[in-house]
Swiss-Prot record:
The lineage of its organism: Bacteria, Pseudomonadati, Pseudomonadota, Alphaproteobacteria, Hyphomicrobiales. The active site is at C285, H369, E371. Signal peptide: none annotated. Residues 1-204 are annotated as: CPSase. It catalyses: hydrogencarbonate + L-glutamine + 2 ATP + H2O = carbamoyl phosphate + L-glutamate + 2 ADP + phosphate + 2 H(+). This is Carbamoyl phosphate synthase small chain. One of its GO terms (molecular function) is carbamoyl-phosphate synthase (glutamine-hydrolyzing) activity. InterPro entries: Anth_synth/Amidotransfase (IPR050472), CarbamoylP_synth_ssu (IPR006274), CarbamoylP_synth_ssu_N (IPR002474), CarbP_synth_ssu_N_sf (IPR036480), Class_I_gatase-like (IPR029062), CPSase_GATase1 (IPR035686), GATASE (IPR017926). Residues 208-396 form the Glutamine amidotransferase type-1 domain. The gene is carA. Composed of two chains; the small (or glutamine) chain promotes the hydrolysis of glutamine to ammonia, which is used by the large (or ammonia) chain to synthesize carbamoyl phosphate. Tetramer of heterodimers (alpha,beta)4. GO terms for biological process: 'de novo' pyrimidine nucleobase biosynthetic process; 'de novo' UMP biosynthetic process; glutamine metabolic process; L-arginine biosynthetic process. Pathway: Amino-acid biosynthesis; L-arginine biosynthesis; carbamoyl phosphate from bicarbonate: step 1/1; Pyrimidine metabolism; UMP biosynthesis via de novo pathway; (S)-dihydroorotate from bicarbonate: step 1/3. Its EC number is 6.3.5.5. It holds the Pfam family GATase.
Amino acid sequence: MTKTTLSSDPWSIKKPTALLVLADGTVIEGEGIGAIGIVEAEVCFNTAITGYEEILTDPSYTGQIINFTFPHIGNVGTNSEDIEDLTPLHHYGAVGAIFKAHSSPSNYRANENLNQWLKKHQIIALCGIDTRALTALIREKGAQNAVIAHDPNGNFDINALKERAQKWSGLLNLDLAKEVTSKQSIEWNEKPWIWNKGYTINNEYNFHIVAIDYGIKRNILRLMAAQGARITVVPAHTSVQEILAMKPDGIFLSNGPGDPNATAEYAVPMIKTFIECNIPLFGICLGHQLLALAVGAKTIKMHQGHHGANHPVKNLITEKVEITSMNHGFTVDSTSLPQYVEETHISLFDSTNCGIQIIGKPAFSVQYHPEASPGPQDSHYLFQRFHDLIVNYREQSNK
């Protein structure tokens, strides 16, 4: 394909300082902000209106460039409290971002503007393009392998960038969980943010949850802490023996990036053992996919994925609809679920699987993000469900 401008300003004649080069040869020009450099990644689009800082620091976006459909990004600035990456010094999350327009901040919590923050977090950004036209392209052709490049002088070797985009192998068969996981165990006690108080600390522990970190988000941990849990976050490569020695009352399988089939090589044998031990299990996103793989189901790469804070999901048990936050490019093939696994939730956009539970076992998972951050809180009840399974497990264990 030929070079494409997709500029949001049709009269602009400025020399482009950033490019997005797709593997199909499409070249999109715009203004560069944030980090300077070149990186290969998969381009997806996110339809959330708010929460750009939380989105960009979600480790599940590792290896991806996010095209924001909402036109103005940066309005509320950035701060040190809204980061979702558990280890922000390593800057796990999206490697690139695309905005129609970046705005000056106007918010009492802001301590940096978007450009400064992007530089610090090593995220390359392309601005001044028609992001909805790019979204239409992704919807038609699917998530695209690409290169995003930023040079303040506007010097680019387009042929070389096209070659890099075409040679990048993409997210299939890529285990990114091992790249973003914690390097050592962490004790977590921070609870959700409260107006005029900030984040509070949980000092009363009623039970112990071990959270396996495949790329976990902070707000997931906060909501479990709010239930009175002592939480130990462990690296993804922690052995079954080490986890069982911690005597958990429940085990959480976290969200994370990459191809679940690649992470499954070491994760699935562990999860199978936990299922056999009847320890309560709760999985979110990648954790959901890994639980499904552990019971013999299959996962597949999606055409464009689901990324946004406005995705309707039907609870097949209650017949209620939840508006959810989603971020995944792989999905569980519901036709591959064994008979002893019940499908509990489906997407109302495309009927893809969004939840399962193992019949006769205290184990369940969802594809979407009930913790939101950003997004609606319709699905917070799932943390209470996990809590109730743990309480029942403790009662049975003490008999």
